[in-house]
From Swiss-Prot:
Assembly and oligomerization: Belongs to the TFIID complex together with the TBP-associated factors (TAFs). Binds DNA as monomer.
CDD domains: TBP_eukaryotes
Protein name: TATA-box-binding protein
Subcellular location: Nucleus
Organism whose genome encodes this protein: Strongylocentrotus purpuratus
Chief place of localization: nucleus
Keywords: DNA-binding, Nucleus, Repeat, Transcription
Regions of compositional bias (Polar residues) in chain numbering: 18-29
Amino acid sequence: MYNPSQAVPVSLHKNQDNQDGGQQRSHYPQISSQQSQSYLSVPSIGTPSFGSVGSVSSLAPGSSFIPPSPMAPLTPATPASSESSGIVPQLQNIVSTVNLNCRLDLKKIALHARNAEYNPKRFAAVIMRIREPRTTALIFSSGKMVCTGAKREDNSRLAARKYARVVQKLGFAAKFLDFKIQNMVGSCDVKFPIRLEGLVLTHGQFSSYEPELFPGLIYRMVKPRIVLLIFVSGKVVLTGAKVRQEIYDAFNNIYPILKSFKKTS
């Protein structure tokens, strides 16, 4: 049981404590550890995690790790005992890239390939489409190719191979190198309206909401590194994932938060 008389303020500078003969001093009022956590925690989402690197959202890429201070942005934590939503986000689009490892004559490809268009004044790539899997490819003269529109990882790879085969049949020494999924987009519906104004006020360091410019709230999750578009109707779009599990983890993290801001009629 907590005893106020046992609360001992901790100095912010250990060297100063040693110079004062072991006596600890603090310029701040005495508060318990339980109170300090309540001041620093993000409301309605449980106790924030101080131990993960993701809790320092302002950490620049490539910089050395800095232990999070009490004033550093915190990663909202999902309560461990949160109820399961039973909702599984569905993948809507997968963007992948591949290197054909050869220079390409885009005019020749556009003239001889089916379902291909090329307008260099508008876009410096051939736009090619196939029906199965239903996808679109952007083919650049450098040999780089972007494949978009697939809804499964294996379909994205299969489509990219089909485009590479089309280029090979036109006489180019195309190879299939460095295939990589760059982005996954998923969506779902939580089936209840959401108070976006309250959400942006409580989670302002992670979200932005300007209904005059865009009707959805943009929530930038730190871990996993996913961007969510949250609409008042309850529709949620998740983007920025490299693997499918990141979509699922991000939704499991955000669902208890959305439920706490459910509109009540």
